[in-house]
Regions:
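N-terminal helix-loop segment corresponding to the beta1-alpha1 unit
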Residues: 1-175
Length: 175
């Protein structure tokens, strides 16, 4: 199958999920970005352009870059209608990308097995901070936490020992 025949559903937030969706879109895939109207992708208010404030939803240049070429649909997965729409869309998709914490989909009545029953060919890419297995799987984390744990925070600062607040980019989302 060529990329232009690939249908992707993306619910990933921040940078990691949208970056995967953007890469697949750049290769020709049809990507649909799903997000809640009540809890927008937090990347939408990240670093607004000059003269704008974080209240200018969608103003972030990175959001324009990461969401370029994607269709966008708002769905509330906490409602029956929202879950029905989501299940219908993933039943017809080739790839599903999310950045939910492990167990979140199960808590709203969806599971890996339910995806596979409806669509055995569906490729699921679930990106959480600590993975879906292991002792820290239920812990949430964002770039500053992960860069500190990886030791990257020790690489920024000044020769006299003063530090800066954090590594300046979400490097963990980009690798």
């Amino acid at each position: 199958m060529s990329f232009d025949q690939l249908n992707v559903i993306e619910t990933g937030g921040g940078i990691a999920g949208p970056l995967v969706g953007r890469a697949l879109r750049d290769l020709g895939a049809n990507v649909v970005k799903l997000e809640s109207r009540r809890r927008l992708d937090f990347g939408r208010t990240r670093v607004p352009p000059p003269g704008k404030t974080s209240e200018h939803v969608h103003a972030s240049p990175s959001v324009h870059d990461l969401h370029a070429g994607k269709a966008s649909v708002t769905v509330n997965l906490k409602t029956e209608l929202g879950r029905t729409i989501f299940v219908d869309m993933t039943s017809k998709a080739d790839v599903y990308v999310d950045t939910y914490a492990p167990g979140w989909l199960e808590r709203i009545g969806l599971s890996y097995e339910s995806f596979q029953e409806r669509n055995p060919q569906l490729i699921i890419l679930s990106q959480s901070a600590y993975g879906t297995m292991g002792p820290k799987r239920d812990q949430r984390a964002y770039a500053p936490i992960m860069t500190a744990l990886a030791g990257l925070e020790s690489t920024v600062g000044y020769q006299d020992g003063r530090t800066v607040s954090q590594v300046s980019s979400a490097v963990g989302d980009l690798v």
